[in-house]
A protein has these predicted regions:
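Short, structured segments at the rim of ligand-binding sites
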Residues: 1-278
Length: 278
């Protein structure tokens, strides 16, 4: 998708690194269905394309087909920043002839994707933007860290995010992306299921503290150090009841894995799904 838009991308496999060059030249404002249909995250090009090019045509996203998952909160935030938007034939048409301008935006409900799209758009907008009722997932915080490395002035205040529009982007910057906490949680639950001693390195245990607390209540044993988590064989898995919630609550993306572990427990365990309606 990024290559189609016009970015020059090199994948340095030996360094596990992606290098992006010439990000301001020959940028397309179209993100077609054939690319965006495969992944929900494709809609995240809408905010920055609109902010930089003053227009964008983005296919409605596909992929990750859980729940109805509308993009109404994404569009709600962009309209507050000054965009004119219409949806036709499966595409989002967005325009801001005079550019995006900072605004005060309160999300009706918490959304990771909408928070990220608003962040990316506000980063390029003129003036200050205040986002309220934001998602504060580690991935959102990592995006903010990256944007600040690029030259942004973004602060997190609880569930509020204050963004000062960036006039000049720094070049030749480096950023190390945060580890995938859902992958980590999946492997930890797998370790608990098979009853093997497994050690996970180069991670931040604080990021998945809630998940570890839940698993400890179920009888899973851990040894936790600054950047490692060690899972030990558990003699008995205990029943538990919990609800999925936005971060820092238990993530919906781990409830299916946890359900498998629950089959090992004595008694009846329960999960209430609060993020997706189906």
């Amino acid at each position: 998708l990024l290559k189609f838009i016009g970015l020059k991308i090199s994948i340095l496999k030996n360094k596990n690194t992606i290098e992006i060059k010439n990000i301001d030249k020959n940028i397309s404002t179209l993100a077609p269905y054939k690319l965006v249909k495969t992944m929900r995250a494709g809609v995240l090009v809408l905010g920055p394309l609109l902010a930089k090019s003053k227009k964008a045509k983005i296919s409605l996203p596909g992929g990750c087909a859980i729940g109805t998952r509308p993009v109404n909160l994404h569009l709600f935030a962009l309209k507050k920043l000054g965009a004119k938007i219409k949806i036709k034939n499966g595409y989002i048409f967005a325009e801001a002839k005079n550019g995006l301008k900072g605004a005060s935006i309160t999300f009706p409900s918490i959304s990771v994707g909408a928070t990220e799209n608003a962040l990316l758009a506000a980063f390029y907008a003129k003036g200050k933007t205040l986002l309220r009722n934001c998602a504060i997932e580690p991935e959102v915080k990592d995006l903010i860290k990256f944007l600040n490395v690029l030259g942004g002035k973004i602060k997190i205040l609880g569930r509020k995010i204050l963004i000062n529009g960036c006039n000049k982007i720094k070049q030749n910057i480096k950023h190390e992306v945060i580890f995938d906490r859902i992958e980590l949680g999946t492997y930890i639950i797998a370790a608990a299921l098979v009853g093997k001693k497994i050690k996970f390195n180069k991670i931040d245990p604080k990021v998945i503290k809630n998940e570890i607390d839940v698993l400890r209540k179920m009888g899973v044993k851990f040894k936790i150090q600054k950047s490692t988590i060690e899972v030990f064989k558990s003699s008995k898995i205990k029943k538990i009841s919990l609800s999925t919630k936005p971060y820092p609550g238990f993530p919906t993306d781990l409830q299916a894995q946890l359900m498998v572990l629950m089959t090992k427990a004595q008694g009846i365990s329960r999960i209430r799904e609060n993020i997706f309606e189906n």
